[in-house]
A protein has these predicted regions:
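Bacterial Sec-dependent N-terminal signal peptides
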Residues: 1-32
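Contiguous segments within soluble domain cores/interaction surfaces
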Residues: 26-47, 52, 58-59, 63-103, ...
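Surface-exposed, low-complexity/disordered segments
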Residues: 40-44, 59, 80, 116-121, ...
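Short amphipathic beta-strand segments in non-cytosolic proteins
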Residues: 85-99, 216-228, 301-308, 398-405, ...
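Short, acidic Ser/Thr/Gly-rich low-complexity loop/linker segments typical of extracellular
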Residues: 101-105, 228-234, 511-519
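Ligand-binding face of N-terminal immunoglobulin V-set domains in extracellular IgSF glycoproteins
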Residues: 111-115
Length: 580
């Protein structure tokens, strides 16, 4: 009897183990991913920074004035997450020439860089970020490059930018390594699959001319012509291509010389993601070839880290699966459309732009064409919504000397930066060009821009919970001094070390204490202040007055890596002021 009872219990255990060991249905898996991603977006909202400058170029001896805005990326409202904003002036060699910490009040702040007359002229980058913006695996920060000229001593309005050689031992700003002529290809969705037609974007660049316009022809490796192609705008274009096992060859002629470029090799099996962004709707299609194992996947539509929708896809050979998204139900800006499998891996990805439905209109009133020298200027600004109704607004206005200002009609602005360029890789040349009019050509050019500069695998594993998220930086609700205490001799991390802090502010002395954690780290909240303060930090181990075998390291090197300049940044094409 005991043996029978034992056998019965054993059989029940085996059956229950089998039930629990089954893979859950795809709908359940992706629903869990959706819920996890929603929770992640609520827990870890992202920030964006934008600086409004008083000019587009400067002279040595000038002052760069700016107004800072920090917003919640998803909701486009002022952020209250971060209090300090770090703003850096980086020279042409990649060294930080000046740095300021701006106090934000409900997402707003202001500051300036004084350009001393002893500094070298050249192209300088201003970048701005909060620590929380650097917390994610793909840190984002605001960046803008300005020419700073040397003003001539003559009566003529002449200006120049100096060039200088650096010692080979000095660190320099990284450079983009380009061939004499480069032609790069960007398959839609990130990959080509044998036998499946894909849209392929391309970008043509010259080391000496930057973005160039050209045309060419696509051939098989046996020499059979497939199709022709040409650039549409700023060296970019696209064509349709059905790959085979052998990559096609692109042939172009530029300045009388023939060039050959190979397309990316196609995968023997897999999925192709196709997007058609029409007025009022975005259609999504997923196709697979006969060699692809049948499976159920999901297409996720994300905006600034938050999923807005997902659709299950069970792709079959010669039966592409498709669905449509209504544009009016989507948030404005760059959307990430990702195809993921049950394991949470991104199979294919595509960026698409969702246009804002009702942009605000700003109308200046009361301006004159000509003013007498030193005469006061009065101007009223009216901000209306799409219905013509006035709405309350916070504005910053820049007033420039037309004769001493470079002007680009399609330069970056608040609209293009927050909704477009801040979500793309690389430097975007004159982003305002893509919004000068609502036309099929501009829509096509913008779509190609996203194919080129949005081409990457957007890792959703942390978003959906398949990979743990560990923030690289902590949000700062106030200015905090971070550091670490180590042994001077052995370089060991010293835990449970008492630190006493004494800060002199005007005629007042501020004191405080803290203790290092198990890894020797410490943090000291700082009071509000402006300018520079003198501080003394001392260490003490329990039972001793001072700990002489201790070194204090201040964490001040968390800036993002310096990027390479784009050709267009060093060779700007300024518009004449007659075209203002």
């Amino acid at each position: 009897m005991k043996n029978k009872r034992f056998l019965f219990i054993l059989l029940c255990s085996i059956l229950m183990t089998g039930v629990h060991g089954e893979n859950p249905p795809a709908k359940v898996v992706f629903e869990q991913y959706m819920n996890q991603a929603q929770t992640f977006a609520e827990t870890y909202p992202r920030e964006k920074a934008y600086l409004h400058f008083d000019n587009t170029s400067y002279y040595v001896g000038d002052t760069i004035w700016f107004k800072a805005y920090v917003t919640l990326a998803e909701k486009q409202v002022f952020s209250s997450i971060s209090r300090p904003l770090y703003v850096e002036l980086v020279d042409q060699a990649g060294h930080i020439a000046d740095k300021q910490i701006i106090k934000l009040t409900q997402g707003e702040g202001n500051g300036q860089f004084v350009l001393s007359k002893s500094m070298l002229s050249g192209y300088y980058e201003v970048r701005a970020y909060t620590r929380w913006m650097l917390a994610f695996n793909e840190p984002h920060y605001f960046s803008r490059t300005f020419p700073i000229y040397q003003l001539s001593n003559s009566d003529q309005l002449e200006r120049s930018i100096s060039t200088y050689e650096l010692s080979p031992s000095m660190e320099t700003r990284p450079e983009e390594t380009k061939e004499k002529l480069s032609l790069r290809f960007f398959p839609e969705g990130g990959q080509l699959v044998e036998g499946l037609t894909s849209q392929v974007a391309f970008k043509a660049e010259s080391k000496s001319e930057g973005e160039i316009n050209l045309s060419g022809t696509l051939y098989t490796q046996e020499g059979q012509e497939i199709t022709s192609f040409e650039t549409l705008h700023d060296g970019m274009g696209c064509f349709e291509y059905t790959p085979s096992a052998k990559p096609a060859i692109a042939k172009v002629n530029y300045h009388g010389k023939d060039y050959k470029f190979s397309l990316p090799k196609a995968l023997p099996n897999g999925y192709v993601l196709k997007i058609n962004n029409n007025a009022g709707a975005i259609s999504v299609e997923v196709a697979c070839n006969a060699s692809t194992p049948q499976d159920t996947l999901a297409v996720f539509v994300n905006h600034q880290g938050r999923p807005y929708a997902y659709q299950l896809i069970s792709c079959q050979v010669n039966k592409p699966q498709s669905f449509t998204l209504l544009s009016r139900k989507l948030p404005p800006g760059v959307l990430q459309i990702s195809l993921i499998n049950r394991a949470g891996n991104t199979i294919s990805e595509r960026f698409v732009f969702s246009s804002p439905r009702a942009p605000l209109q700003i109308s200046p009133n009361g301006l004159k064409t000509i003013y007498a020298p030193y005469a006061p200027i009065r101007c009223e600004l009216q901000v209306n919504n799409a219905l013509g109704e006035p709405i309350p607004s916070k504005l910053s206005v820049s007033i420039r000397d037309a004769l001493r200002s470079d002007y680009s009609a399609y330069d970056n602005n608040l609209f293009t930066d927050l909704l477009l360029t801040s979500d793309l890789k690389g430097y975007i040349h004159q982003p305002g060009y893509y919004f000068t009019e609502a036309s099929p050509r501009k829509q096509k050019e913008l779509d190609i821009l996203l194919l080129v500069h949005g081409w990457r695998k957007y890792d959703m594993s942390q978003l959906i919970g398949t990979t743990p998220f560990v923030a690289n930086q902590a949000p700062e609700s106030q200015l905090v001094l971070y550091g670490q205490v180590k042994s001077t001799i052995l370089k060991n991390k010293l835990k449970n070390i008492d630190l006493s802090v004494m800060v002199k502010k005007d005629a007042n002395i501020i004191t405080g204490q803290t203790v290092t954690d198990e890894n020797g780290y410490f943090s000291i909240p700082m009071e509000d202040f402006e300018g520079e303060l003198e501080a003394i930090i001392q260490t003490r181990r329990a039972g001793k007055e001072r700990n002489k075998d201790a070194s204090i390291f201040i964490d001040r090197h968390f800036s993002p890596a310096v990027r390479a300049y784009d050709y267009s940044e060093l060779h700007p094409k300024w518009s004449s002021i007659d075209r203002w």
